[in-house]
């Protein structure tokens, strides 16, 4: 089962009620607690990278968020030269490593002109350019999602 949830993942413990009350993020927290694999996806730019780093720090500080055997992967999406310079993937990985000890699993590139052309022509990237860097990155993500873990 794949469940798409959005940040934030904080627990509303600071809210007090006279009785049980619904929590704003109850569905998100329940889905994460039941997950055997989590892919955290952030935007590869000056806003998205710090947000993903903050999320990763929150995950590290909250061992109760997932089962101990949960595989958590961190990916950056829409990596592009306009946002990060000539070698965007290398820069994103360097910036990630500067602040985080856990590995950045992958970076998905983005080429707006190519994507715009595909949408305009009603084409799928996999059909038109099956070896494109975006396709290879998404294949790597999917392989990681469905990889069998030792002992599972």
Regions found by a protein language model. Name each.
Residues 35:
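An anion/phosphate-binding loop that grips the pyrophosphate of nucleotide cofactors and donors
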Residues 1, 38-39:
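Short, well-ordered beta-strand core segments
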Residues 120-152:
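NTP-binding/hydrolysis catalytic cores, primarily Walker-type P-loop NTPases
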Residues 25, 49-72:
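Conserved C-terminal guanine-recognition region of P-loop GTPase G domains, centered on the G4
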Residues 1-27:
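Switch II (G3) loop of P-loop NTPases
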Residues 42-44, 61-62, 70-87, 106-114:
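G-domain G4 guanine-recognition motif of GTPases
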Residues 78-81, 93-124:
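Beta-strand-loop-alpha "switch" segments that mediate conformational coupling across diverse proteins
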């Amino acid at each position: 089962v794949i469940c798409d949830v959005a940040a934030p993942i904080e627990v509303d413990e600071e809210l007090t009620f006279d009785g049980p009350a619904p929590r704003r993020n109850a569905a998100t927290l329940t889905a994460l607690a039941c997950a055997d694999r989590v892919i955290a996806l952030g935007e590869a730019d000056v806003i998205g990278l710090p947000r993903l780093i903050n999320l990763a720090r929150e995950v590290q500080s909250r061992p109760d968020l997932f089962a101990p055997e949960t595989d958590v992967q961190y990916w950056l999406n829409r990596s592009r030269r306009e946002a990060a310079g000539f070698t965007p993937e290398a820069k994103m990985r360097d910036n990630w490593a500067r602040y985080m000890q856990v590995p950045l699993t992958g970076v998905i590139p983005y080429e707006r002109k190519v994507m715009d052309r595909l949408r305009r022509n009603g084409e799928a990237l996999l059909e038109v350019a099956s070896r494109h860097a975006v396709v290879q990155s998404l294949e790597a993500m999917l392989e990681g999602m469905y990889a069998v873990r030792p002992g599972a």
